[in-house]
């Protein structure tokens, strides 16, 4: 798929969905902001963000909390301006904090249902086999294990990468049987 906007349409993005993201790029992450900016431009509202963690890198989504694009957050922690916005009552719905194991349990039991999972991957082939290493831009992250449960249980799984490699990209951290779409972007994160 050629763009975030195109993959959102293919996944049937609509109001009220739950979207998942991961924090393996820590404060260098570009994926959350990139996806949420595209969604915001489409006018989609009332979303639940189920992220393994949210930090200062995601501060640009605060206006989306304030305008109702994002109404619920599930995470292991929130820092920076997102934490301040939640503490100041700007989130219209619930903020649910769980440890990483609690997040996995909630997804496996169906307590949390993910409509679309976005997995930032340093490298992927066009079939979706992705790895935590191999980024042309140096944005390797070590592991994609946090995202495995999302890939297994989400209705749609989108791998976002800045490095497409020849098939097969093995050994894959997440294999193509659990991926619906691959989107190549200019950069998934800042390795510094």
Model segments located where?
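Conserved alpha/beta enzyme-core scaffold
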Residues: 1-192
């Amino acid at each position: 798929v050629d763009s975030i906007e195109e993959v959102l349409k293919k996944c049937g993005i609509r109001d009220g969905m739950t979207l998942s993201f991961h924090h393996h790029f820590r404060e260098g992450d570009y994926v959350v902001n990139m996806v949420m900016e595209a969604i915001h431009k489409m006018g989609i509202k009332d979303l639940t963000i189920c992220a393994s963690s949210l930090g200062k890198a995601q501060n640009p989504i605060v206006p989306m909390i304030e305008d109702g694009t994002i109404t619920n957050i599930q995470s292991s922690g929130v820092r920076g301006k997102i934490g301040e916005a939640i503490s100041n009552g700007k989130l219209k719905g619930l903020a649910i904090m769980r440890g990483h194991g609690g997040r996995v349990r909630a997804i496996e039991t169906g307590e949390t249902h993910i409509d679309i999972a976005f997995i930032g991957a340093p490298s992927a082939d066009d079939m979706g086999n992705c790895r935590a290493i191999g980024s042309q831009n140096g944005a390797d992250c070590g592991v994609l294990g946090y995202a495995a449960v999302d890939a297994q249980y989400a209705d749609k799984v989108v791998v976002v990468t800045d490095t497409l490699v020849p098939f097969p990209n093995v050994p894959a951290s997440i294999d193509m049987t659990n991926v619906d779409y691959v989107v190549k972007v200019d950069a998934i994160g800042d390795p510094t």
